């Protein structure tokens, strides 16, 4: 996960 991405991206990243 990276700062700047929404929570939905937290699962993909």
UniProtKB/Swiss-Prot annotation:
GO cellular component: extracellular region
Family stated for the protein in its record: Belongs to the non-disulfide-bridged peptide (NDBP) superfamily. Scorpion BPP (group 1) family.
Localization in the cell: Secreted
Name of the protein this chain belongs to: Bradykinin-potentiating peptide T
BP-aspect Gene Ontology terms: regulation of blood pressure
Tissue and organ distribution: Expressed by the venom gland.
Record's keyword terms, sorted: G-protein coupled acetylcholine receptor impairing toxin, G-protein coupled receptor impairing toxin, Hypotensive agent, Metalloenzyme inhibitor, Metalloprotease inhibitor, Protease inhibitor, Secreted, Toxin
Function of the molecule: Acts as a bradykinin-potentiating peptide (BPP). Induces endothelium-dependent vasodilation that is reverted by NO synthase inhibitor, suggesting it activates molecular targets on vascular endothelium leading to NO production and vasodilation. It appears to induce vasodilation through muscarinic acetylcholine receptor (AChR) M2 (CHRM2). Does not inhibit the angiotensin-converting enzyme (ACE). Does not act via bradykinin B2 receptor.
Main location (coarse class): secreted
Organism: Tityus serrulatus
A Gene Ontology molecular function term of the record: toxin activity
